[in-house]
């Protein structure tokens, strides 16, 4: 009877048991696979985290593998490439890069390098280090030693070569990782260590009797018996920096190498004010794509004899090999100059000092001739793989293309960490003027010209393997604000075939970390962006130099250029000029002047709140007098929230923009300038619950993207969970370009209600490729987009139809859109002005020059104007 009951029970619940077993098996599989899942990558490494435990490092890896594996592509033909490569390229990554590269020159460059690598004539196979090795001799066998499971003879690093182990392979790996000793065991195992094996553990050679899996003619230890070899290097110990200079020591002079990008001119001026002294040198490299910064900073050369801009400029993309090329070129320029200097320190506009210049000079004077770099602080082999040092990268078309795996040269130690360094003049002279007979340096230069993030490893590796190794100090003088969960989002995939990380901007909440630098040999912090947060910079300045007075003018204001009429104009400025010209016309009409030329657009923030952008333009009065005006404009998006919905009551900052920065959780298109080629992103803040006892809720929502014709163009499914803290979320849409110009609607809906609705403007274009649209075909190409992004077989849910226009309404609006898409000249301008006037508010205006008889305040007296006094960024004050 009991058996029959059991049988019935098993038959009844058999499907349930099978499902439970499957779920358990899947969980085990996922747990196993998760061991190898990495975090984010690169720019670097979190060198400040080097003191963490190995357990923490293992659970929070620094750099992720490439974002996706590549399928095996088909071979490329000469017709596809536009030329005949010199070999039949085999590497799948190289073929993929060739398929994606846009220009023929770039494809030829990739193919040439890929063929050279394939032929084995590109990289050096073996190099010889010139760092003193003490009493260690390469490849010397010390014999067979007894090992213990709980107390390894060589405990520095372990790996298992299942099919290829040999003493030589293990020696190469251990030397590369910086270990003086290598050991092979049990046929497949390789161990590395720093400590000399004890004589008491010595065994007869016959105890090591297992053949190597990679070479059966050689012996690779035994069962808990290890063949140990010397790698030929001594244990490396970084130098300890002195804290105070000896009495009577000559004070060093510093060459500050500023590598500048973007448009944050006032922050560059502010950095120069904090660092400036007549005895030091300030050499500035401005990215070759940044006309505005180069033009404005060039003015400093006439005022300051020790400030000079680099004439040979590079496009320094994230992770690019050009960054190392640029640094070496600038260092060479400094060596050729008349200036006398002892150290070069590279900084960006995102750096700021955390100690006074005098303290930095004292510290470096105590450490003359030493070189300050920050190592990765973790296992070298993991660093090599996560950093992509075992891959070849080629830079062209402002992109870093991954073209295949590579084997690093044997015989050298590999090191790396941060690309922010402080280098002595003798070392700079060595790396910038390699002698032909210096095979090591020549080979390393070639290696790192085809390396991702090369400046993060080049200087470290050269120091470790040359006669300069005794000058290595493991400190790059920086504290960096790493927040891995935010900073490692693979946000650089558009410029590099790899996943990358960046440090976060310092915020007021990070102040304790800045305060903690006081007793450490740290002199700079990064990153700072006043357009994200200026309050922390003010706090830092007051900590260093004393409090600002209450009368200090415009202390909490910040201005940053968006557009300047002297810039080289191309397609990137078409949208800005289209909207800017419209706002100029609207502001001119309001002031009763005839607008002539759009001069500048400038972002304005006060107390870290965005107050809009400033439109500066020239105009002519009815009397014939020429004047310049500046108008503050606030972008507006018209939103509605459901009044009675619990979710809507906690919804904030519901807006559509572009350039959403996941790291800083903000859309960097502050002016909300959206056009037919924009990649739209909706972002919002869901406020945390203040009632700890309230029941938790979750919401499954749908975001509808509705075009000016009332058609559904795309939708996103959103899942929002309750939280005790504010959550910033974003949702991208995939629309077909060009997007239809006009008033769009984003609706956030549930099953039966609308939670939020937002109307936003996709502005028509008045320019194309930097030139005004003058013909109907040109206008239709930019403003005539009427396509549908959804697939043809998409079935519209019945409950969504209430949010869209009827077919008749869509037909009528389509005819209107077709006509508008053909407009040029004044009719086009009137269409744009009508739309822009609804989504941008003209708040206030000022006049640049006195004596115009306009009833407007002078811009120099208007605290919001870009012409208002800004003493905190007034670099001319250094001349007084």
From Swiss-Prot:
One of its GO terms (biological process) is chondroitin sulfate proteoglycan biosynthetic process. Pathway: Glycan metabolism; chondroitin sulfate biosynthesis; Glycan metabolism; heparan sulfate biosynthesis. InterPro entries: Glyco_trans_14, WSC_carb-bd, XYLT, XylT_C. Disulfide bonds join 87-115, 131-469, 488-501, 490-499, 846-859. Divalent metal cations. Calcium or manganese or magnesium. Keywords: Disulfide bond, Endoplasmic reticulum, Glycoprotein, Glycosyltransferase, Golgi apparatus, Magnesium, Manganese, Membrane, Metal-binding, Signal-anchor, Transferase, Transmembrane, Transmembrane helix. Its cofactor is Ca(2+); Mn(2+); Mg(2+). GO terms for molecular function: metal ion binding; protein xylosyltransferase activity. It catalyses: UDP-alpha-D-xylose + L-seryl-[protein] = 3-O-(beta-D-xylosyl)-L-seryl-[protein] + UDP + H(+). One of its GO terms (cellular component) is Golgi membrane. It comes from the Eukaryota. Residues 36-880 are lumenal. Residues 1-14 are cytoplasmic. It is found in: Endoplasmic reticulum membrane; Golgi apparatus membrane. It is a single-pass type II membrane protein. Residues 138-232 form the WSC domain. Pfam families: Branch (PF02485), WSC (PF01822), Xylo_C (PF12529). Its EC number is 2.4.2.26. Glycans are attached at residues 135, 139, 346, 700, 729. UDP-alpha-D-xylose binds at residues 287, 316-318, 419-420, 502, 526-527. The chain crosses the membrane at residues 15-35. Belongs to the glycosyltransferase 14 family. XylT subfamily. Catalyzes the first step in biosynthesis of glycosaminoglycan. Transfers D-xylose from UDP-D-xylose to specific serine residues of the core protein. PANTHER family: XYLOSYLTRANSFERASE OXT. This is Xylosyltransferase oxt. It comes from Drosophila pseudoobscura pseudoobscura. The gene is oxt.
């Amino acid at each position: 009877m009991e058996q029959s009951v059991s049988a019935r029970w098993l038959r009844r619940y058999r499907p349930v048991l099978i499902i439970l077993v499957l779920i358990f098996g899947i969980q085990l599989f996922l747990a196993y696979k998760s061991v190898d899942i990495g975090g984010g990558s690169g720019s670097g490494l979190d060198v400040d985290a080097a003191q963490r435990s190995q357990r923490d490092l293992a659970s929070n890896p620094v750099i992720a593998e490439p974002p996706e594996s590549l399928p095996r592509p088909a071979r490329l033909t000469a017709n596809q490439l536009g030329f005949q490569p010199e070999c039949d390229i085999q590497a799948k990554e190289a073929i993929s890069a060739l398929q994606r590269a846009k220009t023929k020159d770039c494809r030829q460059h990739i193919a040439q390098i890929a063929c050279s690598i394939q032929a084995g004539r590109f990289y050096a196979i073996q190099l010889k280090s010139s760092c003193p090795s003490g009493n260690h001799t390469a490849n010397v066998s010390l014999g067979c030693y007894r090992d213990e499971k709980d107390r390894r003879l060589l405990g520095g690093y372990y790996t298992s070569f299942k099919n290829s182990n040999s003493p030589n392979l293990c020696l190469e790996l251990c030397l590369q990782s910086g270990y003086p000793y290598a050991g092979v065991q049990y046929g497949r195992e390789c161990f590395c260590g720093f400590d000399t094996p004890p004589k008491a553990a010595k065994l007869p050679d016959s105890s090591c009797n297992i053949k190597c899996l990679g070479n059966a003619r050689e012996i690779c230890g035994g069962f808990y018996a290890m063949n140990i070899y010397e790698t030929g290097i001594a244990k490396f110990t970084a130098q300890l920096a002195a804290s105070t200079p000896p009495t009577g020591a000559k004070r060093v002079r510093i060459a500050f190498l500023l590598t500048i990008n973007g448009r944050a001119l006032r922050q560059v001026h502010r950095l120069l004010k904090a660092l400036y002294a007549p005895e030091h040198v300030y050499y500035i490299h401005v990215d070759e794509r940044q006309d505005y910064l180069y033009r404005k900073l060039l003015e400093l050369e006439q005022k300051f004899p020790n400030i000079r801009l680099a004439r040979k400029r590079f496009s320094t993309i994230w992770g690019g090999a050009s960054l190392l090329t640029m640094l070496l070129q600038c260092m060479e320029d400094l060596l050729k100059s008349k200036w006398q200097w002892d150290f070069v320190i590279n900084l960006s506009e995102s750096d700021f000092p955390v100690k006074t210049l005098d303290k930095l000079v004292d510290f470096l004077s105590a450490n003359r001739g030493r070189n300050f770099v920050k190592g990765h602080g973790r296992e070298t082999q993991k660093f090599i793989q996560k950093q992509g040092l075992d891959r070849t990268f080629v830079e062209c078309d402002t992109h870093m293309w991954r073209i295949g795996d590579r084997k690093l040269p044997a015989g050298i130690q590999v090191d790396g960490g941060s690309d922010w360094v402080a280098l002595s003049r003798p070392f700079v002279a060595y790396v910038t003027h390699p002698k032909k007979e210096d095979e090591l340096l020549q080979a390393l230069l070639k290696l790192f010209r085809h390396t991702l993030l090369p400046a993060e490893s080049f200087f470290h590796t050269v120091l470790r393997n040359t006669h300069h190794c005794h000058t290595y100090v493991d400190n790059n003088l920086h504290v960096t604000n790493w927040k891995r969960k935010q900073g490692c989002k693979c946000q650089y995939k558009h410029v590099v075939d790899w996943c990358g990380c960046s440090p976060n901007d310092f915020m007021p909440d990070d102040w304790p970390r800045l305060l903690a630098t006081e007793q450490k040999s740290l002199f700079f912090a990064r990153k700072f962006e006043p357009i994200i947060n200026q309050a922390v910079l003010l706090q830092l300045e007051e900590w260093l130099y004393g409090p600002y007075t209450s009368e200090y003018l415009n202390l909490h204001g910040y201005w940053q250029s968006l557009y300047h009429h002297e810039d080289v104009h191309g397609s990137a400025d078409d949208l800005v000029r289209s909207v800017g010209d419209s706002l100029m016309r609207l502001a001119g009409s309001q002031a009763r002047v005839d607008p002539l030329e759009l001069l500048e657009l400038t972002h304005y923030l006060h107390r870290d709140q965005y107050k809009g952008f400033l439109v500066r333009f020239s105009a002519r009065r009815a009397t014939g007098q020429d004047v310049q005006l500046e108008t503050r404009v606030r972008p507006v998006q018209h939103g509605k929230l459901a009044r009675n919905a619990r979710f809507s009551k906690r919804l904030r900052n519901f807006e559509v923009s572009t350039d959403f920065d996941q790291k800083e959780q903000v859309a960097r298109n502050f002016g909300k300038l959206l056009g037919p080629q924009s990649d739209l992103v909706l972002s919002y803040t869901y406020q945390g619950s203040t009632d700890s006892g309230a029941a938790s809720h979750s919401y499954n929502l749908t975001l509808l993207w509705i075009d000016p014709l009332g058609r559904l163009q795309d939708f996103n499914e959103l899942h929002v969970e309750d939280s005790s803290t504010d959550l910033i979320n974003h949702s991208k849409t995939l629309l077909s370009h060009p997007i239809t110009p006009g008033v769009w609607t984003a609706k956030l809906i549930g099953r039966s209600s609308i939670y939020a609705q937002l109307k936003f403007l996709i502005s028509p274009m008045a320019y194309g490729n930097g030139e005004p649209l003058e013909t109907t075909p040109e206008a239709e190409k930019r403003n005539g987009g009427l396509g549908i992004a959804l697939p043809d077989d998409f079935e519209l849910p019945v409950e969504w139809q209430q949010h869209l226009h009827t077919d008749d309404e869509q037909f009528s609006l389509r005819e209107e859109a077709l006509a508008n898409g053909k407009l040029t000249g004044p009719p086009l301008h009137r269409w744009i002005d009508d739309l822009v006037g609804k989504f941008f508010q003209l708040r206030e205006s000022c006049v640049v020059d006195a004596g115009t008889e306009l009833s407007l305040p002078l811009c120099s007296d208007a605290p919001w104007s870009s012409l208002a006094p800004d003493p905190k960024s007034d670099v001319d004050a250094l001349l007084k």
